[in-house]
C-alpha cells in the first residue's frame, strides 16, 4: 500500500509542475482531504496520542503534497513495518518541485478516537470513517457528529499546519 501511495504522490507532484509549466505560475493546483478534526475521547494522554496518530494518518498525503517531502512520522511507520519504497533517484526533486498551491477539503463531521478497547469497540460510521461517538455532540440520523465548531477548528488546524489557501469543497449538516 505504501508503494501505491508513493506513486500517487509522485504523479500528483508531476501534475502540479506540469500545470504550472503549461498554464503558468498564476495557475493554482490543489489537493483534497476528507477533513474533520480528530478529538481525543478523553483527556487521558493515551486517548490524546491515539487521536493524534489517527489524524496523522489522515493528513499523510497532504503533508507530502504541501511540503514536498515525506514527514518523519511516515518514514518511521514504513521503517517499523519493514517497507522499502520503490524510490527512484529523481523522486526527491519531483516531490520538492511539485507542491500544491492550496488545500481543498470536505467537512461533514468531526471524529473522535480513543485508546480504550472497550470504548473503541463501539465505533460508529461517520461519513467514510469509523469513529467513536463523541458524548458532547449530537449526531444525525446517519451517525455523523453535528459539530459546526469542528469546521472552524479544522480550518485553523489546516492553515496553521500548512500556511496554504484553503478551499471548502463540500460540507454538510455536521458543519
Predicted features along the sequence, with ranges:
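Active-site region of glycoside hydrolase catalytic domains
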Residues: 1-175
